[in-house]
Amino acid sequence: MTKIRIQVLALLALTSTLTYAQEDNKKGYLTGSFETNTIYYKDDSKTEAESPEDHFGSNNYLKLDYYQGKFAVGVQLEAYEPVLVGYPAELEKAKLTNYYVSWADKDFSVTAGTFYEQFGSGLLFRSWEDRMLGLNNAVMGARFTYNYKNIVGLKAIWGTPRFGMDFSDTQVRGIDVSFSLSEMLSWQNTSLSIEGGALNRYEKISIDLEEEGGKPYSNGFSGRVNFERSGFTAKGEYVDGGNKYYDFIHDDKLYAKKRANAQLLELGYSGNGLGINLTGRRLEWMNSEIIAGNGSTSNLLNYVPAMSTQYTYMLTNLHPHTPQTGEVT
């Protein structure tokens, strides 16, 4: 199958100003972007690969955000006419998928509608968008953040994650807290912080699973330590992902219960023209899903950080590594 690809990214410098009859004129402004990823497919006689029936695929995104002082409101329209080959099948047709309103100042913010968030490295929880992979698990609900003198940071979320073009029935509730000892003690050349998060996931379960002792909710938590001094960095994270239930027919049991957990350690040094990074981790049953048992590649509620470097402008650096949800590396 031969592909003729058209990629367009249009940044719309849309700026509108609203002036008030006050000494302090406050201005609002609008920003927007439009992206289309369109491919025309042709049959490939050499490989005998056949193109789709309509020979066409197009992923399109229109994003608009309006800012007025501490307030912001935004929408995102997506159209898959049809979705490109290899992308999740649940992405189809056109729909207003994301919309939000928020208020934020220096130390406090609140958002209602869709939002993205991450706890720690993302092993416990991450909602994000990656258009090249067809991923968007934005949460529809509410988010609250607070920062006290860069000493204490707090995030609290509640909502339902997006799956495909709609929002799932699964509910997530979580809180993440960071405490900076170095800021509290006014250390000049050292940074030390202790962080932790907790996440509750709720999804209705089948009668069979309930009869075998399954629960519709799972509770996970994480603990993290970050240290930096004179070019040296050290980061450690422990994650308990909560109970997972898997289809498992053995000894009259339909499901197997597993406890998800992970350990992550990152060490680094940068200075004097030298940079070194060492990463070690252990993962066990760390696949966190929006909809239990759904095999879609977009059915993700967390993120397993890659072990390989993330750039490919040098051929010698192109050694991709696919993260697994159960491994020691």
What residue spans do the PLM features occupy?
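Outer-membrane beta-barrel pore proteins
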Residues: 116-120, 146-148
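Phosphate/ribose-recognition catalytic cores of enzymes acting on nucleotide-derived substrates
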Residues: 98
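Acidic, small-polar-rich N-terminal luminal/periplasmic segments of exported/outer-membrane proteins
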Residues: 94, 118-121, 127-129
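Bacterial Sec-dependent N-terminal signal peptides
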Residues: 1-30
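Signature for the C-terminal beta-barrel architecture of outer-membrane proteins
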Residues: 23-30, 35-57, 66-67, 71-73, ...
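A short acidic, glycine/proline-enriched capping/turn motif at secondary-structure boundaries
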Residues: 82, 108, 117-119
